[in-house]
């Protein structure tokens, strides 16, 4: 009998906890997320010099060394560049 009461109590606590977690995930500010999306550039788009976080995703880094173009553009990162960007803790878009 004690086991059944403890099991029932545990299930109620888990149900309440999972509802609060679901509510927290639903409260993501959509406007803030869209602003962050606009704050980064896709591959082959202009980016901020020296700021790899200005390129979206973990695969994009800012490259300012081009033979035929002036300016800085996002390019696909190599393994070292991905690791370097990961250590910067850039927001994930």
Swiss-Prot record:
UniProt PTM comment: Contains 5 disulfide bonds.
Signal peptide limits: 1-18
GO molecular function: toxin activity
GO CC field: extracellular region
Localization annotation: Secreted
Swiss-Prot/TrEMBL keywords: Disulfide bond, Secreted, Signal, Toxin
Primary residence: secreted
Propeptide residues, chain positions: 19-38
Tissue: Expressed by the venom gland.
Domain of life: Eukaryota
Family, similarity comment: Belongs to the neurotoxin 31 family.
Protein name: U12-lycotoxin-Ls1e
Organism: Lycosa singoriensis (Wolf spider)
């Amino acid at each position: 009998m004690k086991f059944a009461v403890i099991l029932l109590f545990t299930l109620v606590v888990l149900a309440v906890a999972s509802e609060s977690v679901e509510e927290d995930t639903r409260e993501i500010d959509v406007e803030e997320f869209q602003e962050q999306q606009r704050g980064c550039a896709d591959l082959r788009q202009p980016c901020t010099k020296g700021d790899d976080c200005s390129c979206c995703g973990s695969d994009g880094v800012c490259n300012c060394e081009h033979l035929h173009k002036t300016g800085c553009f996002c390019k696909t990162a190599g393994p070292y560049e991905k690791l370097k960007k990961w250590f910067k803790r850039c927001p994930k878009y």
